[in-house]
């Protein structure tokens, strides 16, 4: 598949006649959701016209509707641009921390980002919970590669993470 000057090669397993079907015996992380979206874009850009379905434990379900090949290539092209940016400088997309921020600020009904003080404070709290983790769950801040980029998480660093996360994950 050629997109934005890049030849994409690989396997897209378990393609059904009516689209892609996946299942996971767990809850879905933001990184896994991003992988599903990427597979869906490749499927649609390659001429597939079915939907993308994912079934999760506890009656969870995700569905991506079919996209026209041109629209899928457009979205894929944006992700490739992000990849290229990340090849020349660190692209600070932390899927779980940035995703926690976005889940709090994004209003799906109105397709808008909320930026009132109350929502932003909740988003900061959710971001820090995902970044720092707790006794049961390791936070993204424990990653040694992130620790090499910054010693302490400052408000400026948090902003530098939120902006590309919004662009890439939303």
Which positions does each model-derived feature cover?
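Structural signature of nuclease core domains in nucleic-acid processing machines
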Residues: 1-170
């Amino acid at each position: 598949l050629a997109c934005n000057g890049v030849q994409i090669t690989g396997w897209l397993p378990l393609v059904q006649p009516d689209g892609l079907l996946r299942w996971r015996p767990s809850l879905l992380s933001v990184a896994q959701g991003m992988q599903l979206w990427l597979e869906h874009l490749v499927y649609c850009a390659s001429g597939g016209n079915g939907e993308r379905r994912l079934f999760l434990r506890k009656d969870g379900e995700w569905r991506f509707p079919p996209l026209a090949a041109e629209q899928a290539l457009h979205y894929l092209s944006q992700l490739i641009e992000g990849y290229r940016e990340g090849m020349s400088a660190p692209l600070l997309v932390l899927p779980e921390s940035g995703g926690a921020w976005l889940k709090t600020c994004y209003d799906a009904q109105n397709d808008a980002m909320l930026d009132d003080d109350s929502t932003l404070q909740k988003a900061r709290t959710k971001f820090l919970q995902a970044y720092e983790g707790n006794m049961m769950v390791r936070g993204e801040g424990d990653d040694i590669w992130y620790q090499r980029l910054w010693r302490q998480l400052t408000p400026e660093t948090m902003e530098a993470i939120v902006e590309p996360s919004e662009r890439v994950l939303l």
